[in-house]
């Protein structure tokens, strides 16, 4: 597998995606768990076509910073880029906006 593989996952923030509904906060903004799931989805899909049959990816470490909240109705995109390959360990840079 080579560096540079990318994928963008897209989600429209709806009620079920909010911090209030997911129990991770008390506001109707995109929940952190939803954002992280979208980011993991982008990483998984970036490399899925290149994995051996029957293989998948699992998250091992996530380091994220929030810049602004995403209100209901806003479309959020998470773009993952494979930036490092060390044996079976894959490292991604992922931006959600």
Model-identified regions with their sequence ranges:
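Well-ordered beta-strand positions in beta-sheet-rich domains
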Residues: 6-10, 61, 93
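Short, residue-level hotspots on alpha-helical faces of the histone-fold
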Residues: 37-41, 45
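Residue-level preference for beta-strand/loop junctions
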Residues: 3-5, 58, 74, 88
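Hydrophobic beta-strand-centered segment that forms part of the acyl-chain substrate-binding groove
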Residues: 44-77
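Catalytic strand-loop segment that frames the active site of acyl-thioester-processing enzymes
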Residues: 1-30
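Residues at secondary-structure transition points
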Residues: 30-34, 61
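Hydrophobic beta-sheet segments that form the core/acyl-binding groove
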Residues: 64-97
